[in-house]
Regions:
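N-terminal Rossmann-like NAD(P)+-binding domain of SDR-like oxidoreductases, especially those catalyzing
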Residues: 1-171, 320, 326, 330
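The catalytic Tyr-centered alpha-helix of NAD(P)H-dependent dehydrogenases
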Residues: 140-147, 171, 181, 185, ...
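Short beta-loop-alpha junction of Rossmann-like oxidoreductase domains
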Residues: 126-128, 177-180
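Conserved sequence/active-site signature of Rossmann-fold short-chain dehydrogenase/reductase
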Residues: 123-124, 174-176, 220
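Hydrophobic alpha-helix immediately C-terminal to the catalytic Tyr-X-X-X-Lys motif of short-chain
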Residues: 150, 154, 158, 188, ...
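C-terminal substrate-binding subdomain of Rossmann-fold SDR/epimerase-dehydratase oxidoreductases
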Residues: 55, 197-332
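Generic structural signal for alpha-helix termini and adjacent loop/cap motifs
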Residues: 17, 25, 79, 88, ...
């Protein structure tokens, strides 16, 4: 019987690129992917993936589990828009918490060896002076972080009650080829590339002194695989990457150097964490993470790819659940 892995969110950045990596480096595994194509694109999916177009909340995902009997499950599917989440609360909790609960149920029923769940550094909130350590008690400041933290707790309870093995990974500002650059609510580097491709000024919210740590997608792929397969990763929570720190202004200057973008427009500040710097030693020690690609190198590769992409319409949220307090730059 062939070995099988499931990747949810297989049309997105993490999912599509991990599928490529497994197919190339672990040919003994069959890759099955689920995605509803709400935030990713079918052309991102490797043709060797057995693709199921499904909504994790409303469609019968149990059929996929029953047919395949997965060894490992990588649950990446999520709409990761921290700033937008206060205005789409219902969708945020359905898309993250309810979907994850269904995945957890099926992993338990079918005896999956390990569930790898991608959480977020948004669970930390402001952290300890802007530094995020896995030992800290999470204090999220937005509904997206709340939802992801609830998912983490549910997965840990599933381990305690049902023996479901897991590794919770908290990636940080992962970027690269196959990222959705057409979504105006998330992924600052992709937003800037879209703006430059469409001859718009690149936008910075607030003073631009916010600090972020960026990770190129290629550096994260083998560590994600190790999260599923390494014995030491069992029942661990691990920040992934985030070794290279930049202010938003510094990141914009690097992007301008790579792309030739010239104009910067400053917008009103948002409700967000000022400094977001993870500790990363556990990802090195347990997952074998290596920081191989600096921001300029990664943006150069991403920019080569972005210039070849179709001129899709920009994604605009059709109707907010809550209009009160929404930022002027997001008003429809």
């Amino acid at each position: 019987m062939s070995k099988k892995v499931l990747i949810t969110g297989v049309a997105g950045l993490l999912g599509s690129r991990l599928a490529d990596w497994i197919i190339q480096n672990k040919p003994e595994y069959k890759v099955v992917g689920i995605d509803d194509l709400s935030g990713g694109f079918e052309e991102n999916i490797n043709p060797k993936v057995d693709f199921w177009q499904m909504d994790l909340v409303n469609h019968p995902i149990e059929n996929c589990f029953e047919v395949n009997k997965f060894d490992y499950v990588f649950h990446f599917a999520a709409y990761a828009a921290e700033g937008l989440s206060p205005f789409i609360r219902g969708y945020n909790y359905d898309n993250n918490l309810k979907a994850t609960a269904r995945i957890v149920n099926e992993c338990i029923k079918t005896n999956v060896k390990r569930l790898v769940f991608t959480s977020t550094l948004a669970v930390y909130g402001h952290g300890d002076g802007g530094v995020f350590n896995e030992a800290q008690v999470p204090k999220p400041i937005d509904p997206y972080g709340v939802a992801k933290y609830a998912c983490e707790m549910d997965i840990q309870i599933a381990n305690e009650q049902h023996g479901l093995d897991y590794c919770i990974v908290r990636p940080h500002n992962v970027y690269g080829i196959k990222q959705n650059i057409w979504d105006k609510y998330r992924n600052v580097l992709g937003i800037w590339m879209y703006q430059h491709l469409n001859e718009e000024s690149i936008t910075i919210f607030g003073d631009g002194e916010q600090t972020r740590a960026f990770s190129y997608i290629d550096d994260s792929l083998e560590p994600l695989w190790n999260a599923a397969t390494k014995p030491d990763a069992s029942k661990e929570i691990i920040n992934l990457g985030g070794i290279e720190k930049h202010s938003i202004i510094e990141a914009a200057l690097i992007l301008k150097e790579v792309t030739g973008a010239c104009c910067v427009a400053y917008e009103e500040g948002r409700h967000e964490v000022k400094h977001s710097i993870p500790t990363f030693q556990k990802s090195i020690d347990i997952l074998g993470f290596e920081h191989k690609t600096n921001l300029k190198e990664g943006l150069t590769e991403m920019w080569k790819w972005a210039q070849k992409q179709p001129m899709r319409e920009r994604f605009v949220w059709p109707e907010y659940e809550l209009e009160k307090g929404i930022y002027s730059f997001w008003k429809n």
